[in-house]
Regions:
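Terminal amphipathic alpha-helical/low-complexity segments used for targeting or macromolecular assembly
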Residues: 1-64, 179-196
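Conserved short-loop catalytic and cofactor-binding motifs
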Residues: 24, 28, 62, 86, ...
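Solvent-exposed, flexible loop/coil residues
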Residues: 31, 36-39, 72, 78, ...
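Residues at secondary-structure transition points
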Residues: 31, 47, 69, 89, ...
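Extended, non-globular alpha-helical segments
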Residues: 52, 56, 99, 105, ...
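Left-handed beta-helix
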Residues: 64, 69-70, 75-76, 81-90, ...
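C-terminal segments of enzyme domains that contribute to small-molecule binding surfaces
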Residues: 117-140, 144, 170-196
Length: 196
């Protein structure tokens, strides 16, 4: 567990210039608490102790403002930065080294009527490794966001996203087709890197 925690905290320090130390990240970053509590609630969920798992996830929501369903599958080093309002639905799957900014929703699109027929189906998105999702973005339905894709702030993604795509707008469109911006760094907040 010590190695896991060190790798996790190091990954946050690499991605967040405001992160100063392992201790400060551990004590003051709500996304870290939410991920740790999700690991616990997910383990309990897999033991089929569903109510206890939901109680732990609700405690995490109360403490952090981040809602992660205990059944969601999350890989290594998920960084939820400024996490207030993040929602990760029940059948969501998240790969390794994914970054989510505040108010991101990984949600379903199925209507709440006839929920019995939807109960065992995939309803939420899958984010592959190294995906970055900007603040306020909504990724909805059982779609796949492939590796290294970037989703801009407030984008609404309703269709599968190819590898290395840069998605912006409502509905989101890929602006990285045909390597139009291959040398430019993605800016989830729209701020230029190095004041260029």
């Amino acid at each position: 567990i010590y190695n896991y925690m060190n790798e996790f905290l190091d990954s946050i320090i690499r991605r967040d210039p405001a992160a100063k130390s392992h201790l400060s990240v551990l004590l003051t970053y709500p996304g870290v608490k939410a991920v740790f509590l999700h690991k616990l609630s997910n383990k309990i969920w897999r033991m089929k102790l569903y109510l206890l798992a939901r109680i732990i996830s609700q405690i995490a929501r109360f403490l952090t403002g981040i809602e992660i369903h205990p059944a969601a599958i999350i890989g290594k080093n998920l960084f939820i930065d400024h996490g207030m309002g993040v929602v990760i639905g029940e059948t969501s799957e998240i790969g390794d080294n994914v970054t989510l900014y505040h108010a991101v929703t990984l949600g379903g699109v199925s209507p709440s009527i006839d929920s019995d027929s939807q109960r065992l189906s995939k309803r939420h998105p899958t984010l592959k490794n190294n995906v970055v999702v900007g603040s306020g973005a909504q990724i909805l339905g059982p779609i796949i966001v492939e590796e290294n894709a970037k989703v801009g702030a407030n984008a609404v993604v309703l269709k599968n996203v190819p590898k290395d795509a840069v998605m912006i707008g409502i509905p989101a469109k890929n602006i990285n087709e045909k390597d139009k911006i291959k040398d430019e760094k993605f800016r989830p907040y729209g701020v230029k890197i190095n004041n260029d």
